[in-house]
């Protein structure tokens, strides 16, 4: 009985071990983004429109897949936001500029950590080095918004086959996402994350069901595999132990019958002697 319990516990731990990839799959970078990003609207309104923020920008990030530039951009955003934080005093007000920027720095630092731990086949480097440039608050936080939004597509299988090559005809001045004339658009209620510009939103709106199906399939396969393996081991063990259990029961019954016969014979001899 003790061996049976030990084997059952072993099977349970084996299923948990095989089920572990499902838990890891759900640990997406998007979970690092908190609702603190909704304070960006207030921060942009508080900063002067002609204020310049230094940032090393990846050329062509508007045409390249997100996995080509996201690792570089989050690092550069972390540096720029940290420098911006140093320029403000630590005011105790809950929604002061310092407090908002400090929360954004923590979010970006978490994303940097997530990218560093990401598989190299999903995150690649752009062929061009980032260029130091100056951006207005609207332009800077538009890039911030797109970088935050890019983590939603980081797990896409299609991105693995995309090349990180920028056309030689592309110039930074033609980048629509950093154009001064482009309005700074944010949703009225920024709850979970900030949307990027209309082209990225339209692109994602065409396949949300397909993306969700792929993610659920990736998560379900390890779970199904672990359950099948666990049941297979359990069935094999039960089939192997069943004959032994049957023989054990038969032996116990035979021993009991032999004991009863011996007792009857003993009583019969005692009766004859009397």
From Swiss-Prot:
Transmembrane regions listed in the UniProt entry: 216-238
UniProt cross-references to InterPro entries, sorted A to Z: 4_helix_cytokine-like_core, SCF
GO BP annotation list: cell adhesion; positive regulation of cell population proliferation
GO CC annotations on file: cytoplasm; cytoskeleton; extracellular region; filopodium; lamellipodium; plasma membrane
This protein's record includes keyword Cytoplasm: yes
Cytoplasmic side: 239-274
Glycan attachment sites: 90, 97, 145, 196
Identification of the protein by name: Kit ligand
């Amino acid at each position: 009985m003790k061996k049976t319990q030990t084997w059952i516990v072993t099977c349970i731990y084996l299923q948990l071990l095989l089920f572990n990839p499902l838990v890891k799959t759900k640990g997406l970078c998007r979970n690092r983004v908190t609702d603190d990003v909704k304070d960006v609207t207030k921060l942009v309104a508080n900063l002067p429109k002609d204020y310049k923020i230094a940032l090393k920008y990846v050329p062509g990030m508007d045409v390249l897949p997100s996995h080509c530039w996201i690792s570089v951009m989050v690092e550069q955003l972390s540096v720029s936001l940290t420098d911006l934080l140093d320029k403000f005093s630590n005011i105790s007000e809950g929604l002061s500029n310092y407090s908002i920027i400090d929360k954004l720095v923590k979010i970006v630092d978490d994303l940097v950590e997530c990218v560093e731990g990401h598989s190299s086949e999903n995150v690649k480097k752009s062929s061009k080095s980032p260029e130091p440039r100056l951006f207005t608050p609207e332009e800077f936080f538009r890039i911030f918004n797109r970088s935050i939004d890019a983590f939603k597509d980081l797990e896409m299988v299609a991105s693995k086959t995309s090349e990180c090559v920028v056309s030689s005809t592309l110039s930074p001045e033609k980048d629509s996402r950093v154009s001064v004339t482009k309005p700074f658009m944010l949703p009225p209620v920024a709850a979970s994350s900030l949307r990027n510009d209309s082209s990225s939103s339209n692109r994602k709106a065409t396949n949300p069901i397909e993306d969700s199906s792929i993610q659920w399939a990736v998560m379900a396969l390890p779970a199904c595999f672990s359950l099948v393996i666990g049941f297979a081991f359990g069935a094999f063990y039960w089939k192997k132990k069943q004959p032994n259990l049957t023989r054990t029961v038969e032996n116990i019954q035979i021993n009991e019958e032999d004991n009863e016969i011996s007792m009857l014979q003993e009583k019969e001899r005692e009766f004859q002697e009397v």
